[in-house]
Amino acid sequence: MPSLSLSKLLRVGEGRMVKRLKHIADHVSSLSPEVEDLTDEQLRAKTEEFRARYRDGETLDELLPEAFAVAREASWRVIDQRHFHVQIMGGAALHFGNIAEMKTGEGKTLTCVLPAYLNAIAGDGVHVVTVNDYLAKRDSEWMGRVHRFLGLDTSVILSGMSPAERRAAYAADITYGTNNEFGFDYLRDNMTHSLDDLVQRGHNFAVVDEVDSILIDEARTPLIISGPADASSKWYAEFARIAPLLKRDVHYEVDIRKRTIGVHEAGVELVEDQLGIDNLYEAANSPLVSYLNNAIKAKELYTKDKDYIVRDGEVIIVDEFTGRVLVGRRYNEGMHQAIEAKEKVEIKAENQTLATITLQNYFRLYDKLSGMTGTAETEAAELHQIYNLGVIPIPTNRPMVRVDNGDLIYKTEEAKFHAVVDDVVERHEKGQPVLIGTTSVERSEYLSKQFTKRGVAHNVLNAKFHEQEAQIIAEAGRSGAVTVATNMAGRGTDVVLGGNPDIIADIALRKQGLDPVHTPDDYEAAWDDVLDQVKAEVKADADKVREAGGLYVLGTERHESRRIDNQLRGRSGRQGDPGESRFYLSLGDELMRRFNGAALESIMTRLNLPDDVPIEAKMVSKAIKSAQTQVEQQNFEIRKNVLKYDEVMNQQRTVIYNERRQILEGKDMEGQVEKMITDVVTAYVDGATAEGYVEDWDLEQLWTALKTLYPIGVDYKELVGDGDDETKDITAEELRETLLKDAHDAYARREAEIDGVAGEGSMRELERRVLLSVLDRKWREHLYEMDYLKEGIGLRAMAQRDPLVEYQREGFDMFGGMLEGLKEESVGFLFNLQVEAAAPQAAQAPGVSVTAASAAATASAAPAPAAPRPLPTQEAAQQAQGTAAPSALRAKGLDDGEPRGLTYSGPAEDGNAQLSRRGAAESDDSADAGTRRQRREAARSQSKGKKAPRTKRKR
């Protein structure tokens, strides 16, 4: 019996699911006549009817046909778009928690309206995840028109929003945003010191657009929030001076394929001579090695106008695959500082990790997850294994007739671009629209200059001009249009032959000062007339374009991922339109240089072909496909590795975040503190009495340690004798019981003292604040230690040990040690903090926990969310009713301020680069100087003393 691959095995039963989806779509279509007869008010009233039926026990599955029919009709009335049969199938697949595989141009954005509307009825919030802010804002405004017509609230999460704006956005029925923004909000919620600062209200249902890009490509790079660590080092500038003196293949070697460098002995000698040191690799100089490596990487592997641009004295990363500038984002591990030194701009400080999570583990938080993409079949096994998601192929609405031509390979880049310009000019003259995909800003500008020389009118869409991208894309399908795009993948806008009427109409209305969010009534009133006018204008042009052969997509280079190439091709031939595509390649392309470029060059040399004569051979196409497969496999291994290591952290993170949320929500921590006292005193006693005989116990040292912890009221000499008499017979158990009783009695006296100073119940408030402060600090230290552990764990392989197993074992031990340290420091703080009654304040200072009563007052003043699932502040208010409110108290020396000057690091749209985004500008003078190793040793050597403290449209 032939064996089945895992991918094929996972697709068994797909046919049954597709048949089920067809039956559902038929049922929805059968309800259309009934829904069409409803007035706008009756259609809108259906939402409340569905909510009432849901509260009365009907399930969302039972409501699906009617809800889909209502949303479908609303789409037609509001935006003049009616869901096709296959889009209803896709919407149902999403509702059931699957990935709907829908080809480019099949209307994934419109499809998402159906499951988003249905699941919003439950009132627990729906998150629609896109790849960038532009698409999130566009989709929330565009599809939000339909949802608002039906009485639902929609909102969007954008970078740069304040916590109050984010909280309001999450309170909406449907929230749009990027994967990075959703993930960072989750991490920030677990760093806040006040319930009022929480923004998210749970993880109910998410629809991920371009799911393969977000859950596969970008999953290689974890989300990281960092804070200032090292002060800017003089060594960045020093090594930026030395790097140009070093010669490639003489002083160092570069592996472009693996993106690594290696310094030769000659290079080490030159550096030692420049720095005036004897040995670069001796212990005192070891930190300099990383500065050297980064300086060479900045020189060889990071190219200006390809990987980054310099604007206003700042190095800004360019997403190589999408061509977008990622303003404010930064490379980690000192790489960004090395590039800043190379470009002679201001060098900003390094950071250390404060909170982190992988996209895999973030999206696993959702009760139900689904996604849409045009290319998920090849990753079916990974999607099932990691996210438990099935991939359902949705048929196309019309058959695809695009012609995909074979690749043309030229010997040099110059010859390739000359041929590209000739091809484009020829097609432009006959009126065929052309879309050219490039891989960098530099190449798009080079082509632009060539077209200008030849007198070809064209538009450029790249990292420097993507603000105008909607208008450029809307006009890219007009006859004779030539559009140069850094990369089309993820742009999310269809190129419609003759022009995109919806986008053109939207732009026209915005020029009149109308907006679907701020002036919805005027916008909707003007929409129909403007849209009809635009449609009439583009129809005649669309017929001309079809006669000329449809949209011609021309790729100037192959990308690492076949999926990116397919997405570029997929811009042509949408909805059964004619179209054509071809890739122009050269032996100088990066992919060719990384894989078998030399072999291909020798073949072309033997053929003795002129530079301007291309070859079109299956062998070359196979070599390219093989190279892409190798890169995809490498990236898959990286993703698996990232996930394996994060699994260790995920269990620890879950424990810490659950504990933290309980403290924030005002849970009575008295029992937990009493247990901490028991555990800490027991550990002290067990450590001192491990020898077994009273004569061997160092009770003086034990008492000295206990005195730093709490005011001990027992003299050890009374227990075991004063030295002159014979030692009294006492067991370790008896000693432990005596000291435990003494410690708990001391805590009772401490509680009475605190309540006397700041009012009844103040001890509970102090417990919460101390535990929160210590928990946060110990968790940050633990993340720092885990980072350090992971940096060097790979070396264990040299000792024939599995690095992952070693990381798991040592990580577990370190987490246990962190928890013990947390208990000890918390107990010390609670006994020794100097507490006084604080003067009444109109508002709580940031980062200071509020009392139960003030939490209730604040929560009751907060706007109620639109959906039944309450915000955390409201839950706390409900729990706090009837609780006695202590006076405000102030604890001297307690660090309960939140971290400042944060940096946010996450994946770019292609998932390739580790990037960071500087948070809101905040002063922070607490960054310690020194290398990571020095900071680590300093932290470890701290003394114990410091630890203690509308109308219906015509059809």
From Swiss-Prot:
Residues 943-955 have a biased composition (Basic residues). Its EC number is 7.4.2.8. The lineage of its organism: Bacteria, Bacillati, Actinomycetota, Actinomycetes, Mycobacteriales. Its main location: membrane. ATP binds at Q87, G105, E106, G107, K108, T109, D494. The gene is secA. GO terms for molecular function: ATP binding; protein-exporting ATPase activity. It is a peripheral membrane protein. This is Protein translocase subunit SecA. It is an enzyme of class 7 (translocase). It catalyses: ATP + H2O + cellular proteinSide 1 = ADP + phosphate + cellular proteinSide 2. InterPro entries: Helicase_ATP-bd (IPR014001), Helicase_C-like (IPR001650), P-loop_NTPase (IPR027417), SecA (IPR000185), SecA_DEAD (IPR011115), SecA_motor_DEAD (IPR014018), SecA_preprotein_X-link_dom (IPR011130), SecA_SF2_C (IPR044722). Belongs to the SecA family. One of its GO terms (biological process) is intracellular protein transmembrane transport. GO terms for cellular component: cell envelope Sec protein transport complex; cytosol; plasma membrane. Residues 861-955 are annotated as: Disordered. Residues 874-888 have a biased composition (Low complexity). Part of the Sec protein translocase complex. Interacts with the SecYEG preprotein conducting channel. Has a central role in coupling the hydrolysis of ATP to the transfer of proteins into and across the cell membrane, serving as an ATP-driven molecular motor driving the stepwise translocation of polypeptide chains across the membrane.
